[in-house]
């Protein structure tokens, strides 16, 4: 299932990781593990934020997906998402 992970990094904790040179290594490890369809990075309400679209085949994967973010104090949200083709398919099945 296509999922959207949003992670917002605590500014002080992320600043420390940047100073130590480890934030980029952590992000690269996460991306290598998830093999995302796409990933985007921005600032949101004063926090470093990433949006990662990836495929999750089983809910039991959730702990290993989220834990690297939790370890650095990030706030994480994961939710299923659709692309336009998924939406068309879903709407075509609506009986109304």
What is the role of each PLM region?
Residues 1-96:
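Conserved, structured core segments of small domains
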């Amino acid at each position: 299932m296509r999922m959207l992970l949003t992670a917002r990094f605590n500014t002080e904790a992320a600043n420390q990781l940047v100073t130590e040179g480890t934030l980029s290594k952590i992000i690269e490890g996460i991306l290598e593990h998830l093999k995302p369809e796409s990933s985007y990075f921005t600032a949101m309400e004063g926090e470093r934020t990433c949006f990662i679209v990836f495929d999750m085949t089983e809910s039991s994967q959730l702990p290993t997906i989220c834990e690297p973010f939790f370890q650095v104090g990030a706030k994480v949200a994961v939710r299923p998402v659709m692309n336009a083709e998924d939406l068309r398919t879903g709407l075509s099945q609506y009986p109304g």
